[in-house]
Regions:
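Hydrophobic pocket-lining residues within nucleotide cofactor-binding pockets
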Residues: 1, 45, 116, 142, ...
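N-terminal, active-site-proximal structural segment of metallo-dependent hydrolase catalytic domains
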Residues: 1-57, 61-75
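Acidic/His-rich catalytic or pseudo-catalytic neighborhoods
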Residues: 5, 15-22, 93-134, 138, ...
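Active-site beta-strand/loop signature of hydrolases that rely on acidic residues for catalysis
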Residues: 28-51, 113, 123-149, 180
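Histidine-centered active-site loop/cap adjacent to the catalytic His
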Residues: 29, 119, 176
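Structured beta-strand-rich core segments of catalytic domains in phosphoester-bond hydrolases
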Residues: 41-107, 111-116
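Metal-dependent phosphoester-hydrolase catalytic domains
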Residues: 128-135, 142-190
């Protein structure tokens, strides 16, 4: 499956117009603004111009990092972040994942954006071996059978248990994408 950017033009297969594109950007920015998060991971963006337009449309003052990956589907990863709160120091694009490391407050935090569930296991295993001091957050597709084994907790589990999700399978909602956070990180909710 490969997505061709030319499909998203007025002459392309999907007949995208400037107004349709502007509506997509506005709606995406509105969702991001409603969450008011210092870090926002995006997967499946068409190109850097889309990321630039989303960041500009947000009320928050987001900086961004965009990477085109060597994947067959042509989709890219991006990270929107508040530059006064998060300072990226390293990024490593791979096949269907992007790893971004940086300073968040006094912590060194590693963000693994995964578009492939199997890849998440390898990325987590390697990062824990190579960079054990980094507080890890895994975002996206993940099939880690026991996140606790890697010092991670599933921040999406409670919502899924409450019947919320992103895909419906077997008559129930499930989270297709996960947020696995290092147990050493704390939030206002613990």
């Amino acid at each position: 499956l490969f997505y061709d950017d030319a499909d998203y033009t007025p002459e392309g297969r999907l007949h995208w117009t400037a107004e349709r594109y502007a509506r997509k950007i506005r709606n995406t920015a509105a969702v991001i603004d409603s969450m008011a998060l210092p870090l926002v991971a995006l997967w499946g963006v068409e190109n850097e111009q889309v990321v630039r337009d989303i960041a500009a449309a947000c009320r928050g003052d987001y900086s961004y990092l965009h990477r085109t990956l060597n994947s067959l589907d042509g989709m890219d990863f991006a990270l929107l972040y508040y530059g006064d709160l998060f300072y990226p120091t390293r990024d490593e694009p791979g096949r269907r994942y992007l790893y971004v490391e940086g300073e968040l407050g006094r912590d060194t935090v590693g963000l693994a954006l995964c578009g492939d569930a199997r890849m998440a296991q390898w990325v987590v295993r390697d990062l824990r071996a190579e960079r054990p001091h980094v507080k890890l957050i895994v975002l996206g597709r993940s099939d880690l059978p026991d996140p606790g084994r890697w010092g991670l907790r599933d921040a999406t589990r409670r919502a899924e248990q409450a019947g919320r999700g992103t895909v419906r399978r077997g008559g129930r909602w499930q989270m297709r994408d996960r947020i696995l956070a290092d147990t050493a990180l704390t939030t206002s909710e613990g």
